[in-house]
Amino acid sequence: MKNIMKLASIALVLLFTLFGLTNKASAAKLTLYCSVEIDVCEMLEQAYEKETGTKVAMTRASSGETFAKIKAESSNPKGDVWFGGTGDPHLTAAQENLTAEYKSKHFNDLLPAAQNQAVNANYKSVGIYVGALGFGYNKELLAKKGLPAPKSWMDLTKPIYKGEIQIANPNSSGTAYTTLATIIQIFGEEKGWDYMKALHMNINTYTKSGSAPIKATGRGENLIGICFQHDGVKQTKKGLPVVTVSPEEGTGYEVGSMSIIAGARNMKEAKKFYDWALSPPIQTMVFTSGKSLQVPSNTKAQADPDAPDLSTINLIDYNFKVYGDKSTRAGLLSKWDNDVSVIPR
């Protein structure tokens, strides 16, 4: 009898162990590639895990780096969703069939710019937020150096600002690529490249991340940082002496985007996250947290009261379809590499 009871106990232990292992193995998973600020990425990761029980593996990298990663992994995709970063590389990814078609149930509630992003990408991407381009300067450092406050794109090419400006590298940064595309659209092809060469002479560092220049400006390590305006305002909200500028000539803007990676291993979970991230409660959570000051794409979501008011900014008619085209993008980056970045400063 004792042997029978002992065998029964062992069988029960094995059964529960097997059940636990099976249950663990079948737990939902999601691999998230995230191209917004790390604190927002972590907030999304933790909130989704808590709400759904899904185990999220998140990697944070700039939009250019993430695009390159997805392209390199295309024969054996490892990611499921790409969240954030400027819309241009998302459009390029869609054109190269690196992302999958999916139309969210929240589509009709989105801003026109976010819907246009989806249409231009054949529903292989969608807009999740909107943010205007600009630059910021450290007002304390400006006063110390006795320099005038810059107000326009052209001001940034003046010799008085030599060695005083930072911008990211457009090969790795969506912010910098948007800047390049904006300048070409404002000034035209020939004058636009002349502008980029003149700006290059005033750059002290090309960073990898688009938000790094304005962070350095906030810390007093750099005078002027070219950035999205919400990133400048974020530094000011932290109590740092940053003044954000909307250039007088007008400026471009981003439609920060999200895409499902083609061949995603967890496609069902990817679509679930996609809808979740576009829902009013989640967009309100993200964009009123103080960690992200862009304008949310869902019209039923709330924005942070300190987010830049796009209606007061002179936004150009940015051509996302043209500048998100893979050949246009490759051509601009190649010309910048060969004709601008190599000029001795």
Report each predicted region and the residues it spans.
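Early extracytoplasmic/lumenal segment of secretory-pathway proteins
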Residues: A27-T92
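Extracytoplasmic ligand-binding site segments that recognize negatively charged/polar headgroups
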Residues: S35-E42, K78-E221
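A ligand-binding cleft/hinge motif common to bilobed small-molecule-binding domains
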Residues: D88-T92, G218, L223-P241
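Short beta-strand->loop
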Residues: A100-D109, S125, M154, L240-G252, ...
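A bilobed periplasmic-binding-protein/Venus flytrap-type ligand-binding module shared by bacterial periplasmic
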Residues: G136-L141, A181, V255-N266, M285-T288
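Periplasmic-binding protein-like
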Residues: Y195-H200, Y206-T207, K238-A262, T299
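Mature extracytoplasmic/periplasmic domains
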Residues: I261-F320
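Conserved C-terminal helix/tail region of periplasmic/extracytoplasmic solute-binding proteins
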Residues: Y318-R345
